[in-house]
Amino acid sequence: MQRLAMDLRMLSRELSLYLEHQVRVGFFGSGVGLSLILGFSVAYAFYYLSSIAKKPQLVTGGESFSRFLQDHCPVVTETYYPTVWCWEGRGQTLLRPFITSKPPVQYRNELIKTADGGQISLDWFDNDNSTCYMDASTRPTILLLPGLTGTSKESYILHMIHLSEELGYRCVVFNNRGVAGENLLTPRTYCCANTEDLETVIHHVHSLYPSAPFLAAGVSMGGMLLLNYLGKIGSKTPLMAAATFSVGWNTFACSESLEKPLNWLLFNYYLTTCLQSSVNKHRHMFVKQVDMDHVMKAKSIREFDKRFTSVMFGYQTIDDYYTDASPSPRLKSVGIPVLCLNSVDDVFSPSHAIPIETAKQNPNVALVLTSYGGHIGFLEGIWPRQSTYMDRVFKQFVQAMVEHGHELS
């Protein structure tokens, strides 16, 4: 990202020349306006380069994983230059869904049955045109887990698939029950504490391609689900490695942060309505278990979880559910290489709840902590339409594990 610093310096020089020209033609009428603008520009550039653009903090449980990442995933040690005009966490979080492009992806849908009679929708990108891995049986496979109400249509998922396509890999997106347009066959949705559906999907995908390198990447709640699975199963998983992005490590801390007035207004209430809309489509399936009218009156994610999610999955209290849903305590039991990217200004995942000390005790875990980036933001460049810092971390890490993962054995 040294190029961005050079671009900023070049932009500053061009701005100076432009403003000097405007003074000559009388646009400002005097040199006072020019001096003010130049002074502000220089001060802002200095502040940005000295206080905003920083290298991420890399926390690992051992020298081996740290050296591996420095050698094969150097992006985690490079300076991250957030978008110069939108670097604050909330701004990045709000902007990303609207400004990032959506690369076209043609999916092949598959519905698989579950033990309780339900069904799960998987969206496959087979990448049969791969020239790097022409044999489908050994083509690396990446399982992607979207966020809370996300599907295979999310821009961050599409970008991961686009980058995987460049590497010659195959992708499959795990859509949680009832969110991708498929019928809900049983009165059950999903939560990040219950890993049964994920276990079903992992077993199914691995059975189709047992000889292919198999990795997973989870975003936000998808990352929480993935970490909870890995913490429960340890090394007894067909996955060779995993990556998570913008995970909420402690559900209590996440909820408390999102219930602050500004965060509630910007994020919490909207996501609550999304959750309500998702379950209301299948209202007839839940009327015997929960008071749907009461659920639809929830004003926060915590209220929704108390009235719906915790009840659906048999928890006695919301505190019991949130304790079980938090991946932080299970991090010590993760048995495969996992890279976790978080921003310390993410209001969905407060920095004080990031399990730094726990990560230091597990040689399989690496935390990459940026100073800015928000929640699934990580925008960079002057006009951040294309890939983000998160995308670059994803691409370098999965490629490193596929091509050099044996070095960690």
UniProtKB/Swiss-Prot annotation:
Family: Belongs to the AB hydrolase superfamily. AB hydrolase 4 family.
Active-site residues (renumbered): S220, D346, H375
Superkingdom of origin organism: Eukaryota
Any single GO CC term annotated in Swiss-Prot or TrEMBL for this entry: plasma membrane
Reactions catalysed according to its record: a 1,2-diacyl-sn-glycero-3-phosphocholine + H2O = a 1-acyl-sn-glycero-3-phosphocholine + a fatty acid + H(+); a 1,2-diacyl-sn-glycero-3-phosphocholine + H2O = a 2-acyl-sn-glycero-3-phosphocholine + a fatty acid + H(+); 1-tetradecanoyl-2-(9Z,12Z-octadecadienoyl)-sn-glycero-3-phosphocholine + H2O = 2-(9Z,12Z-octadecadienoyl)-sn-glycero-3-phosphocholine + tetradecanoate + H(+); 1-tetradecanoyl-2-(9Z,12Z-octadecadienoyl)-sn-glycero-3-phosphocholine + H2O = 1-tetradecanoyl-sn-glycero-3-phosphocholine + (9Z,12Z)-octadecadienoate + H(+)
Gene: ABHD3
Topology of this chain in the membrane: Single-pass type II membrane protein
Protein name, as recorded: Phospholipase ABHD3
Upper classification of the organism: Eukaryota, Metazoa, Chordata, Craniata, Vertebrata
